[in-house]
């Protein structure tokens, strides 16, 4: 882990290089980026080619700067080398590869960039190719319904594992679900016949930023030491679920 490298690098007096491996099954399109902090302090090469220094904006936070990886990744193993000059104040932070793709893993240790699924199970999107995802995912489902005369109905979420669910029914915003009871009134937007519900699920930054390697998994309190607790370290990445166990339309007579 990077935190174990930081102290030796700070004590070092010359140049240093760190090598990272990225496994790719399907090269992402159209755009893919490498994200790093303080890029001006380093030089980066990808598969032996110098990474262009053109700034492509920020991601998540203004300190997270994007550099284009277009044309540099290939199927199989890719090598990213981060080089710099050691000094007592240097910081080493995680690197991120971002784009429109899915991530496959068998053991939560090794990960492979692959195609993004278009059909998923909502119970846990972490296991559907989105282990490090942070943001909003839109899930859509159509169904047939014979609407009762009262028109009263609600959408109820079972086992919610999200921060916010923004619910849309036939193109109309029915409201946001953020706490118990995890339900929203949708009757006024339903029609006889085919209905389409879209749920925009929002999660936190936990699966993206961690801590990923604490043996206790999800911690009740997180501080700087939570990311470098050697006594409770595990090489297996620890994620929290993202999704919901089920969603039911309940018609009230």
Regions found by a protein language model. Give the residues of each.
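Soluble catalytic regions of membrane-associated enzymes that act on cell-envelope
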Residues: 17-21, 49
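Aromatic-lined ligand-binding clefts that engage carbohydrates, nucleic acids, or primary amines
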Residues: 22-46, 80, 143-170, 197-201
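Hydrophobic core positions of the immunoglobulin-like beta-sandwich fold
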Residues: 70, 186-187
């Amino acid at each position: 882990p990077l935190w174990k490298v930081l102290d030796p690098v700070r004590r070092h007096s010359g140049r240093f290089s760190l090598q990272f491996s990225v496994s790719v099954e399907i090269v992402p399109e159209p755009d893919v980026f490498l994200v790093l902090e303080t890029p001006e302090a380093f030089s980066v090469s990808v598969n032996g080619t110098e990474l262009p220094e053109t700034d492509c904006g920020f991601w998540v936070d203004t300190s997270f700067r994007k550099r284009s990886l277009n044309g540099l990744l290939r199927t199989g193993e890719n090598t990213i080398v981060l080089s710099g000059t050691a000094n007592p104040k240097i910081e080493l932070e995680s690197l991120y590869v971002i784009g429109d793709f899915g991530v496959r893993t068998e053991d939560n240790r090794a990960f492979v960039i692959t195609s993004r699924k278009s059909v998923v199970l909502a119970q846990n999107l972490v296991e559907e190719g989105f282990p490090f995802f942070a943001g909003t995912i839109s899930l859509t489902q159509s169904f047939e319904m014979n609407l009762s005369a009262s028109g009263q109905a609600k959408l109820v979420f079972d086992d919610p594992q999200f921060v916010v669910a923004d619910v849309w029914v036939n193109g109309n915003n029915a409201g946001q679900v953020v706490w118990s009871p995890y339900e929203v009134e949708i009757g006024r937007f339903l029609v006889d016949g085919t209905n389409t519900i879209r749920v925009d699920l929002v999660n936190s930054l936990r699966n993206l930023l961690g801590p990923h390697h604490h043996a206790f998994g999800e911690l009740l309190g997180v501080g700087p030491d939570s990311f470098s607790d050697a006594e409770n370290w595990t090489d297996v990445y620890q994620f929290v679920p993202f999704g919901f166990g089920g969603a039911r339309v309940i018609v009230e007579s």
